[in-house]
């Protein structure tokens, strides 16, 4: 009995120490916003109370191109594209709900329909009736869903490693299972976030190493991944309210 009590006490002590070591508080919104806004950053409030961060850059007289980022990313993903395309095109980017400087929204709706409403609200706010719509990964899924819902508004689609229909996704997963283990593994963060128990405690943990692994995996371990890039993902994830 004494051994059991000692074991339990030791386990509790280890868990407490681990919790203290792994705990990371949130960063104030004002601090993160000041660092990651630019002179072209704008905010507007949707009817549901969501405060949306977006940018309207490039040639204002050129064709409008709306670009939608992927999961766990932000509009900063498109900054290199703005530099390349901005001379000839008007480039609109935005942070979707639960992402970037938009963060949490009052109605707690973050699914596909909420994403479509956000895109539509941004272009409506800017008075844009027709545009080219593009996105990568999750943003690609937003792109083709929005095009199906509003074909009269979209002049062309740009799909970059887009998420697809469920049956296509299942086929891709089957193909992935045939690849080498180190190539097929999903980023640790995405795997863990599928588990309810982890989601419940994730908001209290320091996400740095998970973020670093996830970014490297998402970028296929490209030399483009710098500490500055990792820090951006990390600090945006720690923005107050983003982990709720």
Q: For each of these PLM feature ranges, what is it?
A:
Residues 79, 120, 144-148:
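Short, hydrophobic alpha-helix immediately C-terminal to the catalytic nucleophile
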Residues 153, 158-244:
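Flexible "cap/lid" subdomain of the alpha/beta-hydrolase fold that forms the substrate-access gate
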Residues 37-40, 45-47, 51, 74, ...:
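Catalytic domains that recognize anionic headgroups
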Residues 1-63, 88-89, 129:
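Alpha/beta-hydrolase fold catalytic core
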Residues 50, 56-101:
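Conserved HGGG/HGGXW glycine-rich cap/lid loop of the alpha/beta-hydrolase fold
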Residues 45-49, 55-57, 96-138, 142:
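Active-site loop/oxyanion-hole signature of alpha/beta-hydrolase fold enzymes
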Residues 77-79, 102-108, 168-170:
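Conserved catalytic-core motifs of eukaryotic protein kinase domains, centered on the activation segment
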Residues 84, 88, 125-175:
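Conserved hydrolase catalytic core segment
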């Amino acid at each position: 009995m004494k051994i059991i009590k000692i074991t339990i006490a030791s386990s509790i002590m280890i868990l407490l120490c681990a919790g203290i070591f792994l705990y990371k508080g949130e960063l104030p919104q004002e601090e993160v916003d000041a660092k990651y806004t630019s002179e072209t950053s704008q905010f507007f409030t949707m009817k549901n109370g969501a405060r949306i961060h977006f940018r309207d850059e490039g040639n204002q007289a050129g064709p409008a191109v709306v670009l939608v980022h992927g999961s766990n990313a932000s509009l900063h993903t498109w900054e290199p594209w703005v530099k390349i395309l901005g001379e000839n095109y008007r480039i609109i980017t935005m942070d979707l709900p639960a992402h970037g400087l938009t963060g949490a929204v009052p109605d707690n709706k973050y699914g596909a329909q909420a994403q479509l409403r956000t895109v539509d609200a941004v272009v409506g706010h800017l008075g844009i009736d027709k545009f080219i719509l593009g996105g990568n990964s999750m943003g690609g899924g937003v792109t083709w869903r929005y095009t199906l819902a509003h074909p009269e508004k979209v002049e062309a689609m740009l799909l970059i490693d887009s998420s697809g229909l469920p049956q296509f996704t299942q086929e891709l997963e089957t193909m992935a299972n045939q690849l080498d283990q180190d190539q097929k593994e999903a980023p640790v963060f995405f795997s863990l976030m599928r588990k309810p128990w982890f989601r419940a405690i994730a908001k209290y943990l320091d996400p740095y190493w998970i973020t670093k692994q996830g970014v490297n995996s998402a970028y296929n371990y490209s030399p483009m991944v710098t500490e500055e890039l990792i820090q951006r993902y990390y600090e945006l994830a720690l923005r107050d309210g983003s982990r709720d």
